[in-house]
Structure formats: C-alpha cells, structure tokens
Design a protein with these regions (language model features):
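Short helix-perturbing small/polar motifs within transmembrane alpha-helices
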Residues: 2-40, 44-147, 167-230
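Short aromatic-rich membrane-water interface segments that cap or initiate transmembrane helices
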Residues: 150-163
Length: 230
C-alpha cells in the first residue's frame, strides 16, 4: 500500500509540475518576452529543478520529457525560430538538472528547506551560479538572434535567476512534509515579519531607477519559510 501511495503521489506531482511548466512558459513568453527572444521573467526552470529534487529518477525522466515537449510547443506557438527550439529546451534542461543536483547536496536526503540559512545557500550556491553559467551558454548559442551575446547573457541571467528564486523554493516549501511539530512563531516575530514585508512592498513601488519590485520575491519567500503552515 505504501508503494502505491508513493507512486500516486509522484505521478500526481509530475503531472502538476508538467502542466505548471507549460502554463508558466506560456505566461512568460507571451507577456515578458523581448525582441531578442529571451523572456524577462522565466519561472519554468525552477519548477523543473524542483521536480528533479523531489522525484525519483524514473519519474524525473518522464517529467523532463513532458516539460521539454511543453516548452518547445509553447515556443513554437509564439513564433520562435525553429532552430532555436532545441537550444532553448536543452539550456532549460541543463539549468534545471544542475540546480537540482546542487540543491540535493545542500538539503541532504530529506530534500527540504529547513530554515532561512538553507534558503540562502540554495540562492547563493545553486540558483545564482547555475543561471549564470547557463546564461553564458545561452549567449554563445543564441547570439544569432536579434540581441547581442552580452544582452542575451544579462537578460537570461536576470530572468532565470529571478524566476528560479520564485518557483524553486515555492515548490519545495509546498511539498515539504515535516516530521514532528513545526515550531510556533511568537506573535512578536509574526508582527515583525509581516511589517517588514509591508515596508518592502511600499518601498518597492516608489520611483527608483533600480527595479525595486524584484525585492518582493526574496522577502515573500523568506516570510513563507518562517511562517509556513503548521
């Protein structure tokens, strides 16, 4: 019975992530894609990486196949160059695999975000270096598009790093199955956290040259990791 429950859970998770990958890819390329073909926000790689962290090898292989096909279909539907479709797919797959490998090393066999320190390590040692490396590869592989290689590198890194910082921790937090009781946060800590989120939200939309709304992402993820449901 335990095996069948695990199989059902993994299958359902894989299906949800595949559909979410396709939906988020459509959202990102339809609403945030620039003329050079690179979206300014890219959530799908983080979803795929989370699946690689949470699923066993066989289910992860099916997830990779489903997400690759979904991503290529979305890019084809919005008119991306045919020769760029496998390049986009390969880069996304490589990025997700590398990020998942590092996250597994960081989180250990329990594969969960235990605290803010773990979240920070994931950002510094998994998300940032992985998306930076993939951005360089994207600049080399997609330099024939409308943008120059440096523009593609910068655009890819900012879009994928921000997107993965949103989607990867979110899935890991949602899928977290803690053992034992979750410590209850004090009322003072809850007030401080909510107050900081409100303050950052207010600052984010003041006139600035820096895109301060990006500050909301780490603030909300950090708050979620501290105030997760019991």
């Amino acid at each position: 019975m335990g095996i069948s429950r695990d199989l059902w859970r993994d299958t359902l998770l894989g299906l949800v992530l595949t559909v979410s990958f396709g939906a988020s890819a459509l959202f990102c390329v339809a609403l945030t894609r620039e003329s050079g073909g690179v979206a300014t926000l890219w959530l799908p790689s983080g979803l795929l990486a989370a699946g690689f962290v949470l699923l066993p090898l066989r289910r992860a292989a099916w997830l990779a196949a489903g997400c690759t096909l979904a991503g290529m279909a979305v890019n084809f539907a919005i008119g991306a160059p045919l020769d760029a479709l496998p390049v986009f797919a390969g880069l996304n797959l490589f990025e997700a695999l590398l990020a998942a490998f590092i996250v597994r090393k960081i989180c250990g066999h329990r594969r969960r975000v235990a605290d803010l320190a773990t979240l920070l390590r994931i950002a510094l040692f998994a998300i940032i270096p992985t998306t930076a490396l993939t951005a360089v590869l994207a600049g080399a592989a997609l330099g024939y598009l409308a943008q120059s290689a440096p523009q593609i590198i910068i655009g890819w890194f900012t879009a994928n790093a921000l997107g993965m910082a949103i989607s990867l921790p979110a899935v890991l937090l949602l899928a977290d199955r803690r053992e034992g009781q979750v410590p209850r946060r004090s009322h003072l800590e809850q007030v401080v956290i909510y107050g900081l989120v409100a303050l950052i939200s207010a600052i984010a939309y003041l006139p600035h040259s820096f895109p301060t709304p990006m500050l909301l992402t780490p603030a909300l993820v950090a708050a979620a990791s501290r105030l997760r449901p019991r």
